[in-house]
C-alpha cells in the first residue's frame, strides 16, 4: 500500500497580511485586524509585530489597545479575504482535486498520487508555497507528513513562512517533547484537565492508557491516545473535482503596455504548461481572463479540437484571445 502524503497549508497571519499587501504603508507595523480600538469586538488576526506586545486572536479589542496603544487597528475586509482565499484554493486545486479547506486561510491536500522518486512531497509543498507567493504576494507555512494530524502539527512549527516534514524517523522525538497545549485540538479547558492529571507533554500523554484517557475525556480520549502515537486515519474530504489548471498574476501597478502584458502572458503560459506536465495532463480549452483597473473582469476562451500542453501552444492561443479581448 502506498504511504499517504498529506500537506497542510496555513497562511501566515492571513487577514493582516492581506491588509498589509493592499496598503503597503502598514508593512512592518503592528497591525490588528477586527475593528476600531474602541469597539466591543475581538481581534481577528494580529501581525507578528503586534504579537510581540501580547496581542492575539480572540482578544477583546479594548485589551489589545491597552497592550499595543500605537497599533494600527483595521476593520475586517471579508470581501478581500474571500477573494484572495478563492485564488489560493484555486492554486491548491491546480495540483490535486483532493483538497479539504478548513477555513479561508488553511487547507489539507492529499498529494499521494503526485509523489514520485524525483518529486517528493516536500518539493511539491515548496512549489505550492512559491505559487501562492507569486500569485498573491502572501506567505504560507506548510506541514508535510503521512496523516492529517501530523501535517497540521508540522505546519505550525516553523511559522512564519516555514515548512516542516514529520516522518517516521522524527515523529516519536517530536511528539514526546511537545507541550500538551501545542497538540492540535487541545484548548484551554482540556489543557487544565491534562495538567490536573499530570499530563504536561506528549510523553505524559503517551504513558496514559486508553482507558484512563476515555475516563477523563469520554470519546475524545481514544483520539488523544492515538495522537500521542502519531496515529490518524482520517481522510482528506474533498468536495470538488478539479477540472482546470491555471495561473494568475496581479500587477503591482496598473499596466496598459501590450509588450509588458504579453511578456507576462508568456510567463504564465510557461507556468501553466509546467503544471500540466507535472500532472501529466493536457488542455482542450484555453481561457484568458483580465481584471481592469476598474475591477471589471473580462474573459474569453477557445475550445480546441486537439489538446495542448506546451508553453508555445498555450501562449499562441492566449495571444489570440488577448487581442480579441483588447479589440472586441
Curated annotation (Swiss-Prot):
It catalyses: DNA(n) + a 2'-deoxyribonucleoside 5'-triphosphate = DNA(n+1) + diphosphate. It is an enzyme of class 2 (transferase). Binds 2 magnesium ions per subunit. Residues 6-187 form the UmuC domain. GO terms for molecular function: damaged DNA binding; DNA-directed DNA polymerase activity; magnesium ion binding. Its EC number is 2.7.7.7. Its cofactor is Mg(2+). Signal peptide: none annotated. The active site is at residue 106. It holds the Pfam family IMS. The keyword Magnesium applies. Its main location: cytoplasm. One of its GO terms (biological process) is SOS response. Mg(2+) binds at residues 10, 105. InterPro entries: DNA/RNA_pol_sf, DNA_pol_Y-fam_lit_finger_sf, DNA_pol_Y-fam_little_finger, DNA_polymerase-Y, DNApol_IV, Rev_trsase/Diguanyl_cyclase, UmuC. The record marks 15 as: Substrate discrimination. It is found in: Cytoplasm. Keywords: Cytoplasm, DNA damage, DNA repair, DNA replication, DNA-binding, DNA-directed DNA polymerase, Magnesium, Metal-binding, Mutator protein, Nucleotidyltransferase, Transferase. The keyword tRNA-binding does not apply. One of its GO terms (cellular component) is cytosol. Belongs to the DNA polymerase type-Y family. Poorly processive, error-prone DNA polymerase involved in untargeted mutagenesis. Copies undamaged DNA at stalled replication forks, which arise in vivo from mismatched or misaligned primer ends. These misaligned primers can be extended by PolIV. Exhibits no 3'-5' exonuclease (proofreading) activity. May be involved in translesional synthesis, in conjunction with the beta clamp from PolIII. Monomer. This is DNA polymerase IV.
